């Protein structure tokens, strides 16, 4: 089995897929895509017309899969190593998939709105859209804070797809929309940052941190207090 992951090391959605692959102890060949390079972008668009990463290509199976959630679920079915990621019981699996949708739609999407808006020319900024994104985050933080425990993972006692979906956006959000006032969420981020699968993602991302469009009001990156110097 030969897996190729088309990705960028700084992408939070790529981290989601990478965490799943690492957790399932699946070896893969990383293929870095530079969307700022016309040739790289054109070649990638030939694989997936939307030119959005991650995309996983399983050479042995002849399968090409876009979308981080789909890749994570595929990884979960390829290996019995590590956590299941998706529970076997239908009702438990449905709960995990609901968390995955919640985290993508109400954490990841607002994150992309806030960060993406900073890349626009000054005259094209969307202040209203950013405010709406921050309001969505406030609701999501409150919801997650009410559901998290002090020792478990995002969706219960077992590490799952929900954690692969939660860790990457929370890491970046801790800078642009701080978690202060949500102690359980802060402790969760600290806990998941110690997870080897996520630490590998952060290690790969570190050389590219200058890509992040910083703002004077931003918090610093999570630091040694969380045992990761980014």
List where the protein language model places each region.
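Juxtamembrane/interface motifs at transmembrane-helix termini
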Residues: 25, 114-119, 182, 207-208, ...
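Short, flexible loop/turn segments with low-complexity composition
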Residues: 88, 200-208
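A short hydrophobic/aromatic micro-motif that marks alpha-helical segments and, especially, helix-coil
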Residues: 82, 119, 178, 209-212
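Acidic/histidine-enriched, glycine/proline-rich intrinsically disordered or flexible terminal extensions
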Residues: 205-230
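GST-like domain detector, emphasizing the conserved glutathione-binding G-site
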Residues: 1-131, 227-230
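Short, solvent-exposed turn/loop segments enriched in Gly/Ser/Thr/Pro and often Arg
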Residues: 8, 34, 161, 205-206
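A local structural micro-motif
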Residues: 29, 83, 156, 200-201
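GST-like fold's C-terminal all-alpha helical module
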Residues: 99, 103-196, 203, 230
């Amino acid at each position: 089995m030969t897996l190729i992951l088309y990705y960028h090391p700084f992408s939070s959605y790529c981290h989601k897929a990478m965490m799943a692959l690492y957790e399932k102890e699946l070896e893969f060949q990383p293929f870095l895509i530079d969307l700022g390079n016309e040739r790289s972008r054109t070649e990638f668009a030939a694989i997936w017309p939307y030119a959005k990463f991650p995309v996983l290509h399983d050479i042995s199976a002849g399968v090409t899969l876009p979308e981080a959630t789909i890749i994570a679920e595929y990884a979960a079915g390829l290996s019995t190593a590590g956590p299941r990621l998706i529970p076997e019981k239908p009702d438990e699996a449905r709960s995990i998939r609901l968390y995955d949708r919640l985290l993508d739609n109400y954490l990841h999407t607002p994150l992309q709105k806030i960060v993406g808006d900073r890349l626009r020319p000054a005259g094209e900024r969307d202040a209203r859209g950013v405010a709406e994104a921050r309001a969505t985050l406030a609701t999501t933080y409150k919801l997650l804070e009410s559901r998290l425990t002090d020792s478990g993972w995002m969706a219960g006692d077992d590490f799952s797809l929900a954690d692969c979906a939660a860790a990457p956006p929370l890491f970046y959000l801790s800078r642009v929309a701080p978690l202060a006032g949500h102690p359980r969420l802060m402790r969760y981020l600290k806990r998941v940052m110690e997870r080897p699968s996520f630490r590998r993602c952060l290690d790969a991302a570190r050389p590219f941190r200058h890509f992040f469009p910083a703002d004077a009001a931003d918090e610093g990156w999570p630091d040694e207090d969380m045992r990761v110097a980014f």
